[in-house]
UniProtKB/Swiss-Prot annotation:
One of its GO terms (molecular function) is acylphosphatase activity. Keywords: Hydrolase. Belongs to the acylphosphatase family. Pfam families: Acylphosphatase. The keyword Hydrolase applies. This is Acylphosphatase. InterPro entries: Acylphosphatase, Acylphosphatase-like_dom, Acylphosphatase-like_dom_sf, Acylphosphatase_CS. The active site is at R20, N38. It comes from Nitrobacter hamburgensis (strain DSM 10229 / NCIMB 13809 / X14). Its EC number is 3.6.1.7. PANTHER family: ACYLPHOSPHATASE (PTHR47268:SF4). It catalyses: an acyl phosphate + H2O = a carboxylate + phosphate + H(+). Residues 5-97 form the Acylphosphatase-like domain.
């Protein structure tokens, strides 16, 4: 299956509930590369790269998130031109600073 890249924004009660750590753990478990970060507007943004089925599974998992989260929406975003370059060398998946 071909590799894909998806950039999403998750809205709801998604900060202060372990969402970034959960996302990183789930992505590594699925073999998905990328990053996750908080945004100042209270949302969480993530980029997932890898086999199409694994990326789709990761996005689907984000619709529920960890137990303490309340996900109101998961929005697909256009992949920013530099988004893939933000995957840190030597790290398959990472948490980036808040933007």
């Amino acid at each position: 299956m071909d590799d894909v890249v998806r950039q999403i924004v998750i809205r709801g009660r998604v900060q202060g509930v372990g969402f970034r750590y959960w996302t990183m753990r789930e992505a590594i478990r699925l073999g998905v590369a990328g990053w996750v970060r908080n945004r100042r507007d209270g949302s969480v943004e993530a980029l997932f790269a890898g086999p199409a089925d694994a990326v789709a599974d990761m996005v689907a998992r984000c619709r529920n998130g960890p137990g303490a989260a309340r996900v109101d929406a998961v929005e697909d975003q256009p992949v920013a031109a530099n988004a893939e370059k933000m995957i840190r060398p030597g790290e398959r998946f990472s948490q980036l600073p808040t933007v």
